[in-house]
Amino acid sequence: MVDDDPSIVAVVSDILIAEGHEVDSAENGAEALMKANGEALVLLDMRMPVLDGWGFAREFRASGKRSPIVVMTAAENARRWAEEIGAEGYLAKPFEIDALIAAVERYATGTH
């Protein structure tokens, strides 16, 4: 999970851990690239310092990594941004817990 908002990271992590998932987090795209190592799924905020979601996605894909990316953003154009970076899905903040769990189940298990 890549998000610069610690409260979002805490809430999403708690939900996913309760559902039996492992969660690793990074505060920005640059940190996430350094940590990237065979993730089942990347939950990605688009507006972050240092390296934003667009930069992360470009470098992540250029490195040959193919983990699904789900954009998580409060911006009205979340769907368009997801399409622009080649993400498999998107969640518009604020999102419902059920939508988060469904997206993780769908994309992390390869049933998309």
Identify the function of each model-found stretch.
Residues A10-D14, A18:
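Charged docking surfaces used in two-component/phosphorelay signaling
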Residues D45:
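Active-site residues of response regulator receiver
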Residues E27-N28, L51-G55:
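Acidic catalytic/metal-coordinating carboxylates
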Residues F95-E105:
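C-terminal output helix
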